[in-house]
């Protein structure tokens, strides 16, 4: 058995390749839909992370090697000398830097040490665990030994560019850092450039220097999808020192393999449950409210029943009154996550009628500066209802003074559910518990999606209770 370097990938040469490939594969659930209309008969194909000729992404090396050691303990294997500097580009002399404005928690210090030991890889910290402070410490550790270092941090959106930049200012990092957005040009003399995905996608080909940076950091790295441009950009950046940070990896195996393949193995993992046990995050209770309807949308064969169900629940007066009653009786700040603009607009109109509540709707057209003002209002007041598009507020938003989060649009996404819960887990002096309200519609798709979310709660070790509300 042999591992050899093949340009930008690694090749596994073995008589047992077919068996190993099969282990690192899953059934292709989309094959049926892709084949529809092309052929009457088809065989269920699989998605593999190792090609038929044994090629795979360098970041998967340790996972594949671990499997081989376990399943083939008596088999000798040979690894080309050129491979180790790629899969483990270790920093030999650096020490973890712990002299920022805020001292590192033990697990943050441990994660930085692992990053320095491996030189690349993924740090998984439960949402609210302090990823930005961890990044700052890691980069200060590298800068202390190389004052000329060039670093690129990729974040999902404009809001996180500003949030990361402001956090670095607050932490008193010593390296020079700058922002790069559609409106802000980067200072190329800086050690560290913080950029959102959008600007990189549009400007990557015109800025060849990006390919030659020393260190790449991808924040919220679970957002790297096989099909998006960021995934391809990460491959084109030559450095082997690539790090990813996230609260959770994709539940979909091929997408998970893609992230690991690009950045490296998971080098540190401390999930939300562990952080809650150790009192780094607040406790959480989930109240699943099963809503039964007097009249239900008609299920018609061949039509878009899912869309019809969404239209039904978003415009249903009984359901919206349930939301209004819960919010009016809750005495602290609430975050209501919606998936569709029209639903958010309707809720904004309804909830704005509640006395003694400040109501905001954060959607795509709301400028980043205004979003920041709303966050500050929430941090300093206790009478705010913030309706937000989940695509905006499910990732990377840091507001400690949230006491209740409502899932008002259902859905079954593993990552979005976990990340959304994380919006309210950060500690706050006025909060001893986060309340999650999960609206579960007793309809065809609503029931299916609710069951998926309950599976997620169980996997995350979060208690939930069930309550029925029936329209009469």
Regions from the language model: what does each represent?
Residues 80-124:
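Conserved pre-motif I regulatory segment
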Residues 118-140:
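Walker A/P-loop
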Residues 132-134, 141-143, 147-170, 341-342:
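Conserved Walker A/P-loop ATP-binding site and its immediately adjacent core
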Residues 162, 177-188, 345-346, 357-394:
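Conserved helicase ATPase core of P-loop NTP-dependent helicases/translocases
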Residues 222-286, 457:
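Post-DEXD/H (motif II) to motif III coupling segment of the RecA-like Helicase ATP-binding lobe
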Residues 301-339, 345-350:
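Conserved interdomain hinge at the start of the Helicase C-terminal
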Residues 388, 397-410, 435-438:
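A short beta-strand element within the Helicase C-terminal
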Residues 412-432, 436:
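Conserved SF2 helicase motif VI
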């Amino acid at each position: 058995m042999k591992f050899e370097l093949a340009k930008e990938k690694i090749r596994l040469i073995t008589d047992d390749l077919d068996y190993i490939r099969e282990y690192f594969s899953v059934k292709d659930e989309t094959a049926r839909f892709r084949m529809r209309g092309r052929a009457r008969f088809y065989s269920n194909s699989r998605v593999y992370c190792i090609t038929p000729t044994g090629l795979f992404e360098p970041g998967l090396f340790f996972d594949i090697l671990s499997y081989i050691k376990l399943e083939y303990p008596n088999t000798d294997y040979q690894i080309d000398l050129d491979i180790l500097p790629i899969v483990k580009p270790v920093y030999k002399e650096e020490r973890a830097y712990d002299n920022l404005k805020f001292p590192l928690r033990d697990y943050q210090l441990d994660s930085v040490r692992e990053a320095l030991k491996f030189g690349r890889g993924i740090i998984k910290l439960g949402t609210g665990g302090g990823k930005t402070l961890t990044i700052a410490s890691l980069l200060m550790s590298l800068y202390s030994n190389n004052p000329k270092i060039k670093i690129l941090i990729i974040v999902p959106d404009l809001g996180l560019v500003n949030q990361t930049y402001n956090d670095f200012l607050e932490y008193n990092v010593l390296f020079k850092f700058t922002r790069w957005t559609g409106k802000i040009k980067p200072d190329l003399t800086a050690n560290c450039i913080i950029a959102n995905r959008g600007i990189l996608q549009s400007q990557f080909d015109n800025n060849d220097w990006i390919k030659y940076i020393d260190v790449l950091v991808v924040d919220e790295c679970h957002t790297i999808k096989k099909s998006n441009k960021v995934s391809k950009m990460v491959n084109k950046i030559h450095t082997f020192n690539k790090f990813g940070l996230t609260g959770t990896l994709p539940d979909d195996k091929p997408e998970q393999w893609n992230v690991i393949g690009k950045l490296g193995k998971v080098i540190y993992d401390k999930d939300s449950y562990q952080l809650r046990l150790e009192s780094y995050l607040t406790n959480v209770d989930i109240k699943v409210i099963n809503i039964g309807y007097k009249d239900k949308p008609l299920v018609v064969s061949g039509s878009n029943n899912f869309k019809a169900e969404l239209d039904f629940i978003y415009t249903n007066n009984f359901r919206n009154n349930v939301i209004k009653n819960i919010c009016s009786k809750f005495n602290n700040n609430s975050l209501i996550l919606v998936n569709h603009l029209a639903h958010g607009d309707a809720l904004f109109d309804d909830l704005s009628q509640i006395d003694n509540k400040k109501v905001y709707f954060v959607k795509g057209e709301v400028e980043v500066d205004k979003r920041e003002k709303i966050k500050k209002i929430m941090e300093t007041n206790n009478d705010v209802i913030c309706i937000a598009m989940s695509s905006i507020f499910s990732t990377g938003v840091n507001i400690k003074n949230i006491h209740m989060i409502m899932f008002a649009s259902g859905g079954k996404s593993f990552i979005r559910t976990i990340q959304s819960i994380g919006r309210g887990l950060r500690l706050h002096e006025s909060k001893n518990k986060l309340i999650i309200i999960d609206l579960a519609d007793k309809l065809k798709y609503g029931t299916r999606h609710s069951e998926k979310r309950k599976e997620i709660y169980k996997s995350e070790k979060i208690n939930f209770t069930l309550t029925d509300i029936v329209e009469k």
